[in-house]
Amino acid sequence: MTSRIERRTQAAIAVLGAGFALAGAAVAASADQERKPRPVRASVVGSAEFVLPYHQDKDVRSFTFDAQAAPYSRPLPGIPGGLPTDARGTVKVSHYSAERDITYTSKGRVDCLVTGVRTATLTAVITEVSPGGPPIVGKRVGFSVHDGGDSKGEGEGGGKGRSKDRVGFSWNGVNLLPKGTTPPEEAPVGTCMAPAPYAPVTEGGYVVAHAELPSPPPSPKGSTEPAGPAPK
């Protein structure tokens, strides 16, 4: 009888031990998931319509982004190794004019991207404009994005889709150079320069994947020049 009781006790201890081992593994797996590294490369993707808070009309405006960081990939004079903010990808701007009943579009090539937690600025050089659009081919324009999260989950509240997202852009009076008594001119846009995301998204949304700006890669063997820009 004693032997049978001992065997049952040992079996119960073994089962409990296995349970604790499984629980420990689950906790460890959960901790590993929480410690997952951030994306190696930053990105901004998505398409959304938005409204201008300072101008109400029936026009339909939208931006589409497919931008990825490509650090140290765009050599510049004096900076042969490029910059940590270098990027690639595309942007598309669409503007339906209710007054003219026509949609104007333009496309651009991304050249710079910087991200923070749920926020980003990027710039692109316009490569294509639809007939009747402004003569801006070759011009750099800037955009900013606030990723408000999924409004059904971790976002800031209700609304349709990702309607807590916001965008900003570098034209329509937010990037001017006042010159005394003469009318101000629109200022040139530098890489990664854009105003804060001031325009609320009404449909669609964006996803910002944040990654820290990386250090320059090692200099090529035998080279005395740094691979990236020298800190000042």
Regions found by a protein language model. Name each.
Residues 22-47, 53-55:
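C-terminal region of N-terminal signal peptides and the immediate post-cleavage residues
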Residues 114-177:
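Acidic, glycine-rich flexible loop segments
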